[in-house]
Amino acid sequence: MAKGQSLQDPFLNALRRERVPVSIYLVNGIKLQGQIESFDQFVILLKNTVSQMVYKHAISTVVPSRPVSHHSNNPGGGSNYHGNNTAASQQSQEADDAE
């Protein structure tokens, strides 16, 4: 499995599994919204009032409506969607709150 897939797949799977609403921005600037129904190596099925097959090569950014947790193969277990360790992320949030 390619390194890119090892981050991409757990992230997309968490969004799919938790039915998190997402905004997907395409490289041409179009914004699509919905829930990830399914995905593979090349496409994402995005469901709103209809299902749309969106080719990954046309996607610029995937923005969840809320943070999601996903597990990777990295030592330390869980990470949030920014790719940070959950404990480090919590400490960072506490430091921000203290300011």
Curated annotation (Swiss-Prot):
One of its GO terms (cellular component) is cytosol. Residues 64-99 are annotated as: Disordered. Signal peptide: none annotated. One of its GO terms (biological process) is regulation of translation, ncRNA-mediated. InterPro entries: Hfq, LSM_dom_sf, Sm. The keyword RNA-binding applies. It comes from the Bacteria. Residues 9-68 form the Sm domain. GO terms for molecular function: RNA binding. Pfam families: Hfq. Disulfide bonds: none annotated. Keywords: RNA-binding, Stress response. RNA chaperone that binds small regulatory RNA (sRNAs) and mRNAs to facilitate mRNA translational regulation in response to envelope stress, environmental stress and changes in metabolite concentrations. Also binds with high specificity to tRNAs. Homohexamer. Belongs to the Hfq family. NCBIfam families: Hfq, PRK00395.1. This is RNA-binding protein Hfq.
